[in-house]
């Protein structure tokens, strides 16, 4: 799938047959038929899928999460590519930024690969995860891969301790200065397949608290096909803030290439690109705060 970015060439699980791999690679998908992903992407039927609803009362306080401070060693990225892939906006980071500490295996580093956005057509929805069944207008994902154990993100997908995703909820309020570099060029990549290089992007501006102490952790999956498991999720308690004008720039984006003929009943607007929450099953949500 040419539009799936880092998972398009992901290494398949060993037990999959070659024809199954080819079938997954060649199938388009969308959010309107999200419940059917499992028909083509078997991992989407797994027991430990994402996103989930975070019930704050049921989260288990784990003080050991603070024994080793969660440490993002992020650097400013020069000449970052921002792409509309028809499903989301991706910011591909070329500079080597790494994450370690907190709930992550000791001595292992996770390299930041990209930032992805999920948003609603209206402010009442948009985030993939919910907190006590409350949705936010947007959710950002900072996607990392284990560069200690694997040679590439393709190798890390679907493996235990392979992927770590930091999720940040977004609410409407003041303009987010750190995201201006992205929102200001969205009009230039309105259609699927369009990309633009921005001169500078600082992922540190996305972190809500310099102490990084208020977060939840659970084990889950990618939220887009192939929905591979083995993903550690770190969700920050306090949301970022962007302006109404900034989120409206996302809502002008399109799911199709310019000039494409749309199917009946489809307006081509890119929005509501979030997967429904999945059953928690027997998983435990840990909290680094009380």
Swiss-Prot record:
Any idea which UniProt keywords this protein has?
Metal-binding, Phosphoprotein, Zinc
Site note Ancestral zinc ligand, residues: 116
Q: Which residues form the Alpha-carbonic anhydrase domain?
A: 27-289
InterPro entries recorded for this chain?
A: CA_dom, CA_dom_sf, Carbonic_anhydrase_a-class, Carbonic_anhydrase_a-class_CS, CARP_VIII
Which residues act catalytically here? 87 (proton donor/acceptor)
Q: Give the binding site residues for Zn(2+).
A: 118, 141
Phosphoserine occurs at 5
Claim: Cytoplasm is one of the keywords in the record: no
Q: Which GO terms describe its molecular function?
A: carbonate dehydratase activity; zinc ion binding
Q: What does this protein do?
A: Does not have a carbonic anhydrase catalytic activity.
Q: What family is this? A: Belongs to the alpha-carbonic anhydrase family.
> What is the protein name given in its UniProt record?
Carbonic anhydrase-related protein
């Amino acid at each position: 799938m040419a539009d799936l970015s880092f998972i398009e060439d992901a290494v398949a699980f060993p037990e999959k047959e070659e024809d199954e791999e080819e079938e997954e690679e060649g199938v388009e998908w969308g959010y309107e038929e999200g419940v059917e992903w499992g028909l083509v992407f078997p991992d989407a039927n797994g027991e430990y899928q994402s996103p989930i609803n975070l019930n704050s009362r049921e989260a288990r306080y784990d003080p050991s999460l603070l024994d080793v401070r969660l440490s993002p060693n992020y650097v400013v990225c020069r000449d970052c590519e921002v792409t509309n892939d028809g499903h989301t906006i991706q910011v591909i980071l070329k500079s080597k930024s790494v994450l370690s500490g907190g709930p992550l295996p000791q001595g292992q580093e996770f390299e930041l690969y990209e930032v992805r956005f999920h948003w609603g057509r209206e402010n009442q929805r948009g985030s993939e995860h919910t907190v006590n069944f409350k949705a936010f207008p947007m959710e950002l994902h900072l996607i990392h891969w284990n560069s200690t154990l694997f040679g590439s993100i393709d190798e890390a997908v679907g493996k235990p301790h392979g992927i770590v995703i930091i999720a940040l909820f977004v609410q409407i309020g003041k303009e987010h200065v750190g995201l201006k570099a992205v929102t200001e060029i969205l009009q230039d990549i309105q259609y699927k397949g369009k990309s633009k290089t921005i001169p500078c992007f600082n992922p540190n501006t996305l972190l809500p608290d310099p102490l990084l102490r208020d977060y939840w952790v659970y084990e889950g999956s990618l939220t887009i096909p192939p929905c591979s498991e083995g993903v550690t999720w770190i969700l920050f308690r306090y949301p970022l803030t962007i302006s109404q004008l900034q989120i409206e720039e996302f809502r002008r984006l399109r799911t199709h290439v310019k000039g494409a003929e749309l199917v009946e009943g489809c307006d081509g607007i890119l929005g509501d690109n979030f997967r429904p929450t999945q059953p928690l099953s027997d998983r435990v949500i840990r909290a680094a705060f009380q």
